[in-house]
């Protein structure tokens, strides 16, 4: 694990695991539990991007920059959320 990583994936025996913040940034505090991702390619360690609540990001989908994914939103395929975008209770 690199010193600059902002989260770790807590595997739950399925393909997707919950994320846990390793440091505070933006609206996220150290040790906050976030949503689900399939791998580190789904969520950047740079910027203030985060997957909140029960949101899921998987496949080749990516969240980066300062983008946020909330609620029970699902991001999959080759979808990207970036910049200051917010995805709330949507399926892309």
Task: Place the predicted regions along the sequence by residue.
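A detector of tandem-repeat and repeat-rich interaction/domain scaffolds
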Residues: 44-91
């Amino acid at each position: 694990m690199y010193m600059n990583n902002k989260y770790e994936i807590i595997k739950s025996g399925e393909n997707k695991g919950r994320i846990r913040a390793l440091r505070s940034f933006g609206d996220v505090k150290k040790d906050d539990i976030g949503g689900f991702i399939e791998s580190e390619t789904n969520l950047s360690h740079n910027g203030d991007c985060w997957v909140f609540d029960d949101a899921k990001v998987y496949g080749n989908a990516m969240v980066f920059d300062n983008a946020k994914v909330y609620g029970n939103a699902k991001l999959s395929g080759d979808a990207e959320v970036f910049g200051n975008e917010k995805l709330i209770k949507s399926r892309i």
